[in-house]
Swiss-Prot record:
Signal peptide: none annotated. It comes from Methanococcoides burtonii (strain DSM 6242 / NBRC 107633 / OCM 468 / ACE-M). This is UPF0212 protein Mbur_0968. Belongs to the UPF0212 family. HAMAP family: UPF0212. It holds the Pfam family DUF555. NCBIfam families: PRK03922.1 (NF003035).
């Protein structure tokens, strides 16, 4: 059995915000509030990075229209004693998905560690 570091991305909708910084703060706070009661404080939450198609500069994954933001969050957790990287990603999606119901999740990276 092997240990894995699994990275997921989540699409988080935030209403009634005017700036990208406000949207990021609210999204991270709301995600934390939903993870902590389930004792998932080991899940790292951060804003994702998107690259500009024109200049390739990185910027925070936030899009705002009509005071509603779509924030791309990155969720990271370690999975111990998984049979494969596929098994580790299923475990991570299941654990995080139970706390973040109705939030789209996608696996972006699975890395083995000792």
């Amino acid at each position: 059995m092997t240990n894995y570091h699994v990275t997921l991305e989540a699409a988080w909708l935030v209403r009634d915000v005017e700036t990208a910084d406000d949207a990021i703060g609210v999204a991270i706070s709301e995600a934390g509030k939903r993870l902590n009661p389930k004792k998932l404080d080991f899940v790292e939450v951060d804003v994702g990075t998107t690259y500009c198609p024109a200049c390739s500069e990185p910027f925070g994954s936030v899009f705002i229209a009509a005071n509603t933001a779509l924030v791309g969050l990155v969720l990271e957790m370690k999975v111990f004693d998984a049979e494969s990287d596929e098994h580790a990603s299923r475990i991570a999606k299941s654990v995080i998905g139970k706390a973040l119901t109705d939030v789209p999740l996608n696996v972006v990276d699975v890395e083995e560690f000792d």
